[in-house]
């Protein structure tokens, strides 16, 4: 069986999609809990860019320190139900995955910083600094809720136009982009911290 080491945290984030992909493609995952929530892996000392997820493939020793690189490597290296079959299919899957990445980076990640109280300026939440300074937490939540609605509506309209609104993102076949979207949606619907988004909307964030 193919086998990788995967360093992440005990949260959904960008790492859960990798676990799901590995399960669907028959890849064994050795989970390493990274600092600041674990002691198996030190991202600041061991990861090339000081971030997680980080992955090492036992078959060839390759190490990757970017979620998109990890995802595309796994579905290409180890063929399975999520492997694109044509260049066109790969491009469309990559486009939808990039939408999820933007949504995660500019909506979910700043929300996470508010939820966990990370108000000090650092590389990941600099985009929040002005908002928090000018209006505090309440303004930050309102602005991020507005951005959530805008991004979700754009995706919904595009899917309606493409005819895929009741199927998967690329049609009748589940893609690795669907896996990332699933983890993003369930994060907003089910996790306790994102109750602030549900309360601000007064509903399920992806109800419509």
How should each PLM-predicted stretch be described?
Residues 100-207:
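GST-like fold's C-terminal all-alpha helical module
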Residues 1-138:
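GST-like domain detector, emphasizing the conserved glutathione-binding G-site
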